[in-house]
C-alpha cells in the first residue's frame, strides 16, 4: 500500500460564511494548495474545525474537496471523536467518498487507558479500507499514545504513520527503531520541523502552509536534498509566522491570515472566537514582512 503520509501536508482551514460552509472559498483554498504542489491536504482536522461540523457538513466538505482536487493530490480526512461509534461513521463515510486516507487522535476528554486507545483504533481499522495516520496531540486529547501502543498499532496493516504534536524530539528515533520499515513519522508543529526530521521524521502537517505553501514546500525540498543551510535560511524567515499563527488558539490566527489575504471570510465557530486586535496586527505585520501574496 502506497504511504501517502509524507512530505508537506497542509492542515487546511474550513471556510464559513453566514455559519454555513463556503464552498466557493473552499475552491480558492484548495486550488492555492494544488498550485504549489503540496504533497497532501488534510480536511476537517483540528485546523479545519472538524469537531464543529455536523455529519452532513462533514460529508459535503469531503465530497466537494474530492471533486475540486480531482485526484491531483491526496486528500486525508480527519476522523477524530471521543465517541468510537461516531469515529467509525466518519471513517466509513471517508471510505465511501473515496478520500485517500484518514487521521485520528485518541479520544479526548474521556481519558481512555492505553488498551482503550488500542481498541478505539482497532475499531476504526475494521470500519474501512483506508490508510490511517495516528495523531498524537496530548494538549488537545488529554491522553497520548505510549511508545508500546504505537508499536502495537503499527502492526495493523493499514496504520502507516504517526503525526506527532508533542515536544519529545527523541520520540521519532525511538519509534523509528522498532516499527515496520514503511511506517512514517511526521511532526505537526511547524517550528520544529527541521529538528524533528533530523531525528527520523519524513515531513510535517503544517498550519503555515495554508498561506505560505511555496515557502514551506521549498524548505522541505532543500532539506531532502541535504541543503541544510538553505533549509535553515527559509526556516528562520518563517519562524515569526509560525509563532504568530499560535499566538492564540489554532485555527483562530490562521483563519484571520487567510481572510487578510482574501482566501475566505474571517468566520470561525464558537467556542472559538475571532482573533484579537493585537493578534491581527501581529499577523498583518508578518505577512507584509514576508511579502506573502496569493
From Swiss-Prot:
Signal peptide bounds: none
Localization per record: Cytoplasm
Binding positions for pyruvate per the UniProt entry: 47, 205
Site label Part of a proton relay during catalysis, positions: 46, 109
Known EC number: 4.3.3.7
The keyword Cytoplasm is assigned to this record: yes
Disulfide partners: none
GO molecular function, one term: 4-hydroxy-tetrahydrodipicolinate synthase activity
Entry-linked InterPro entries: Aldolase_TIM, DapA, DapA-like, Schiff_base-form_aldolases_AS, Schiff_base-form_aldolases_CS
Domain of life: Bacteria
Swiss-Prot/TrEMBL keywords: Amino-acid biosynthesis, Cytoplasm, Diaminopimelate biosynthesis, Lyase, Lysine biosynthesis, Schiff base
SMART domains on file: DHDPS (SM01130)
Substrates-to-products reaction catalysed: L-aspartate 4-semialdehyde + pyruvate = (2S,4S)-4-hydroxy-2,3,4,5-tetrahydrodipicolinate + H2O + H(+)
Pathway: Amino-acid biosynthesis; L-lysine biosynthesis via DAP pathway; (S)-tetrahydrodipicolinate from L-aspartate: step 3/4
Major localisation: cytoplasm
GO terms under biological process: diaminopimelate biosynthetic process; glyoxylate catabolic process; lysine biosynthetic process via diaminopimelate
One term under GO cellular component: cytoplasm
Active site (record annotation): 135, 163
Role: Catalyzes the condensation of (S)-aspartate-beta-semialdehyde [(S)-ASA] and pyruvate to 4-hydroxy-tetrahydrodipicolinate (HTPA).
Family to which the UniProt record says this protein belongs: Belongs to the DapA family.
Oligomer and partners: Homotetramer; dimer of dimers.
Stated name of the protein: 4-hydroxy-tetrahydrodipicolinate synthase
